[in-house]
């Protein structure tokens, strides 16, 4: 763990020198900066440090354990909690072979059955105490395989056969590059700008939502918001608390215990519909409620969307691990979600007008009177 502490302190010091605050940076610039920083469950410290560096000068940042950070904005007694995730899904180094190749594992269960199979033949980045190390998940020469073997190679892929080549010949050489067990392994942060004002990239949705909260703090810092508001970036959101049945995310359970909010807004991602399916990409953020029907929070967000002139979609769906801890009367909770096409793949696609609408609605909601 010592190398993680060194990595965190070094990055935080560099950020303090290079970037003291966002200084009016637009949403797209902030999103691009956060997108470049790897952040998987248990390794959120680099993204947390980056967010600290982008927040306005004079804003006090609280720590809530496990890597969660938060900003408290003044106002009438509340609090209202705005919560987003710091961590995305990824892998970690589980072993170093005598030949210098790396084996992989996950800190948390995958979001879907095909998640690990995307690794086959792909470049990866190992974040070490000495800096990023490039590698590639090896695969046999596909042109030499029969169609049956190719199908088996893809459909039968598992982490048990994943092998990462980092261009060395021994375990000693791998460690000389800084490789240690538990180092996070992620896809390269390659952002592709698509037609129709869309972006594509790995873990793009989580980073875009985190950027939206940075933008909200920048817009509201020093102003009196409708209620005392805590804006938090939570670590450990993909790791479930102990128990039976549907279990809450550790990070959100700790956030509820720490701040005891009267109302919570979970800012999350949601899989956009396929083809013309709902929720529609480009149709605005999605307000998700556990129970159908009117509520004070729904009315407040409908008003905020109207004031912002932004589209808003509605969905009734079961609680997610992020929202579950807050579903305790008399507290209220809703999820404001960014539609993401191909969610939890190396090529998540986000419509920038959806991201902009989400931020504008959230900021109007937080203005005086918006959270009543």
Please provide the spans of the model-predicted regions:
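N-terminal hydrophobic/helix-forming segments and targeting peptides
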Residues: 5-372
